[in-house]
Amino acid sequence: MPVQHVKLARDRRKKRAYIKVGVFFVAILLILTGILLTIKSKPEENSIFSTFDSGEYHELNTSPNENSTALQPDENATSYDDELQAKDDEVDEVKLSSDDLDTLPQHAQDALNGLLDAADQAIRITDQFSYTVTEGDTLKDVLVLSGLDDSSVQPLIALDPELAHLKAGQQFYWILDKNDNLEYLNWLVSEKEERIYERLEDGKFKRQVIEKKSIWRKEVLKGEIQNSLNSSLREKGLDTRQISQLSNALQWQVSLRKLKKGTQFAILVSREYLGDKLTGQGNVEALRISSGGKNYYAVQAANGRYYNQQGETLGKGFARYPLQRQARVSSPFNPNRRHPVTGRIRPHKGVDFSVSQGTPVIAPADGTVEKVAYQAGGAGRYVMLRHGREYQTVYMHLSKSLVKAGQTVKKGERIALSGNTGISTGPHLHYEFHINGRAVNPLTVKLPGTSSGMTSAERKQFLVRVREAERMLKP
């Protein structure tokens, strides 16, 4: 925070302190006036009024008689004003006692005590400051704005070591006394917590931690896909991590890239509230997408990961071979293989299975047909499948393709017949396995499977969550 901003905050608080002092003195005057009126309203305590009431005074007889004597001026008196002045000098100073204040009603005494405390604090305070922490700030950086040094910082950090690890966005409010010593520090740690440090008479500080209680509420957010599922989920407040996890759980059930505009979805979230205000903390418990007349779910388990309704990650998982039965490997995966036709060193990015022409080729896992094409100078007729976002499989030298681009396939479904097209030494199937675009050995790669890693008890708890998600996200 710029120094100018701190100065403005200090001046603004000074004005409020002056207003408090003014209110205090006005209240004192009003109370004193009320006390004086109360005293005067008691006739029995005033000798003048009691004399009139007793009848001791009679009607003045103004007729002269022989026993009366005329008033003679006093030769020693200097003036009438002197006599008045003498009388004034004899009057005692009027003082309010605690007994007079005790006669006030209780609510008036409470109000007076409150005003006295406020005025005392306002008089003692000379400077007030505020600051919002930025990245890399330390407590010393904060307090130096008001002229304090390490001698004020170290006792606070010794009392609360967490003051040595400030986070951007946290706020501080602090007060200096008339001697420019730190008297009060308020640290807004988060929306749910604040810590107060007050200086005692011995110079040490005491700490008070105030925690606000929050509540978590489950809510359903509904929407329709506009540009893409990811952007639509982001508009609903989901962060990048949550979107990625949900996409990973759904990608094996439905082709996310082919979801059309207007596709409906519903999200089950739990959110934290302070009163009626969101704290920004929340969790996505489940997601439903309705496409092609079917509902697809991603439900969070106790381990924080998302699975389909059966607790599976990849539906039926991957098979090791793209054939109905195991076949002989005629050429293994080899990044430095010499091509048998061209004679040049050329990486062999897959495995060749020696099979007769027309042998059925099957999908090793659920997926989508990404490409069907023909390359005369190499792969011949080939098919490429995509399995989620990470995995691709490629099948070359085919005699016939049985699928079309964009088509969804299931594990074990026939996708082509083996052949001898392109540059080939004889009938065989060339099979490649790619992870994030990089070819790996199909026979040794660790295949992604269906196991969730959940125990029997965890799976039972997960299925309870599934039923709750289905009930709350029901279309």
From Swiss-Prot:
CDD domains: M23_peptidase (cd12797)
Known cofactor(s): Zn(2+)
MF annotations from Gene Ontology: metal ion binding; metalloendopeptidase activity; peptidoglycan binding
Record flagged with keyword Ubl conjugation: no
Keyword Calcium: no
Cellular localization per UniProt: Cell membrane
One Gene Ontology cellular component: plasma membrane
Residues the record lists as binding Zn(2+): H348
Highest rank taxon of the organism: Bacteria
Region (Disordered): 55-79, 330-350
Pfam families the UniProt entry points to: Csd3_N2, LysM_OapA, Peptidase_M23
Membrane topology: Single-pass membrane protein
Feature: compositional bias, Basic residues: 336-348
Protein name according to UniProt: Uncharacterized metalloprotease HI_0409
